């Protein structure tokens, strides 16, 4: 069994959950004109972030694997401009494109994670906020936990839209 098989399964289950929500996402209103800095994300913004964060965290894992001395600096904060601007840009993409990116990035992440051995999973990085973490911890927290949290966020956003639709007269 691959070292990160349980985490990979969590990623696949989360993807399947996101796919089951696709019809509701397609029927949801487009992202508002204002950028999502002072409000909750709508469905398409959440998907845009998931699409952005998968390759980001894979890149950070690769940075740690390639680093000559441990712990290798890695990570970012939620207010980093590149993160925010990517979500701002991609939140208006058509839903089929958001899902195509999800499939592409998630499969790439899964393939790479299944290649890692115990020694690689034990490599350490150092995050400014979280401190030292192994690659296994990064995969667990920054990929698996993270995508599961956003699945819940997406489902809640869609439930909110459905509740608003039901409460409208007519």
Q: Which functions belong to the PLM regions below?
A:
Residues 16, 51-55, 107, 114, ...:
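Solvent-exposed alpha-helix faces
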Residues 48, 59-66, 111, 140, ...:
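Generic alpha-helical structural context detector
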Residues 96-121:
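Short, positively charged, low-complexity/disordered linker segments
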